[in-house]
C-alpha cells in the first residue's frame, strides 16, 4: 500500500503538538535541575532536559524540511539533534538507575535480557525494507508473427498529461541533502542502537523504581521511553516499507505521548520534592 495523502494542516498540527510537548517537558526538567530540593539529583534532570530540547530542535528542522521546503530526505539536519537526544536521555536514565544501587534478581535479569533481545529484533526487522514477490511484473505474452499476420504496428504515442510541477526546493537545501544522503545507512544504524538502549534503560528504570513514594515520577519517565521507542520503530518501518509515506500516522502520536509523559514525571518529581522539603521545615 502507498502512503496516505494527508492534508497540510494535519501535518502542521501534528508537528505543533510534538513541539509543545517536548518544549514543556524540557522547561519542567530544567526547573528540576535548578531546584535544590530535588531528591533524585539535579544532574539527572539536566540530562533529560537536554534530551527534550535536542528533540525539539531536531523536530523543528525536520518539520521545516518536510513541510516548509517540501523535501522528504533520507537525512536532514534534524538528525544531528535527534541522535544527541538519545545520548542525553540514556545518560539521565542511567544516572537515575545508578542512584538506586540496583540489585536485580535472576528473574529480573531474565526479563531484562528478553526485552533487550526482542527490542533488537523488532528494531532490525522494522528498519529492513521488505521485498514483496509481487514487485516483479509477469512477462508479457507475445504471439509469433506469421506470414499471414499483419505487420506489427508501432505503438501510438499519446501526449502525456500535463502535471503541475512540484515546488522547487532552494538550491542550498538540495545541495545539503545530496551531501547528507551518503550517511543515511550509518544514521539508520545509530537509531537502531539508540532505540535498543532506550528500551533496555526504560525496563531497568521500571525495575529500579517499582515501589515507593518517589517511584511514580520515574515510571512516567520509563513509559515515555517506551512511547518514544514505539513511535521511532514505526517511523523506521513506514519510511522503509510504505511508498510515498507521509508523517502524521496514528503511531506517531506516541512521540507526543513521550513528551507529555516526561513533563508529567518532571512535574510530579518537583511537587513531591518541594512538599518533602516543606514538611521537614514544619517538623
Residue ranges, per PLM feature:
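Polytopic alpha-helical membrane-helix bundles and their juxtamembrane interface segments
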Residues: 1-283
Amino acid at each position: 500500500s502507498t502512503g496516505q495523502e494527508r492534508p497540510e494542516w494535519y501535518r502542521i498540527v501534528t508537528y505543533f503538538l510534538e513541539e509543545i510537548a517536548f518544549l514543556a517537558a524540557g522547561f519542567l526538567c530544567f526547573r528540576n535541575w535548578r531546584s535544590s530540593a530535588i531528591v533524585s539529583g539535579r544532574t539527572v534532570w539536566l540530562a533529560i532536559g537536554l534530551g527534550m530540547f535536542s528533540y525539539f530542535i531536531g523536530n523543528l528542522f525536520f518539520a521545516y524540511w518536510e513541510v516548509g521546503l517540501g523535501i522528504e530526505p533520507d537525512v536532514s539536519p534534524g538528525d544531528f539533534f535527534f541522535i544527541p537526544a538519545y545520548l542525553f536521555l540514556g545518560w539521565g536514565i542511567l544516572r537515575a538507575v545508578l542512584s538506586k544501587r540496583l540489585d536485580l534478581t535472576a528473574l529480573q535479569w531474565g526479563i531484562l535480557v528478553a526485552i533487550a533481545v526482542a527490542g533488537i529484533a523488532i528494531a532490525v526487522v522494522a528498519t529492513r525494507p521488505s521485498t514483496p514477490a509481487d514487485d516483479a511484473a509477469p512477462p508479457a505474452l507475445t504471439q509469433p508473427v506469421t506470414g499471414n499476420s499483419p505487420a506489427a504496428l508501432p505503438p501510438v504515442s499519446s501526449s502525456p498529461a500535463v502535471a503541475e510541477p512540484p515546488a522547487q526546493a532552494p538550491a542550498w537545501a538540495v545541495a545539503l541533502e545530496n551531501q547528507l544522503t551518503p550517511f543515511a545507512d550509518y544514521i539508520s544504524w545509530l537509531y537502531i542502537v539508540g532505540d535498543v538502549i532506550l528500551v533496555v534503560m526504560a525496563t531497568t528504570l521500571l525495575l529500579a523504581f517499582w515501589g515507593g513514594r518517589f517511584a511514580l515520577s520515574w515510571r512516567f519517565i520509563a513509559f515515555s521511553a517506551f512511547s518514544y521507542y514505539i513511535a521511532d520503530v514505526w517511523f523506521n518501518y513506514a519510511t522503509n516499507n510504505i511508498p510515498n509515506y507521509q508523517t502524521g500516522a496514528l503511531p506517531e502520536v506516541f512521540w507526543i505521548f513521550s513528551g507529555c509523559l516526561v513533563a508529567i514525571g518532571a512535574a510530579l518529581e518537583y511537587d513531591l520534592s518541594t512538599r518533602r522539603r516543606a514538611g521537614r521545615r514544619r517538623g
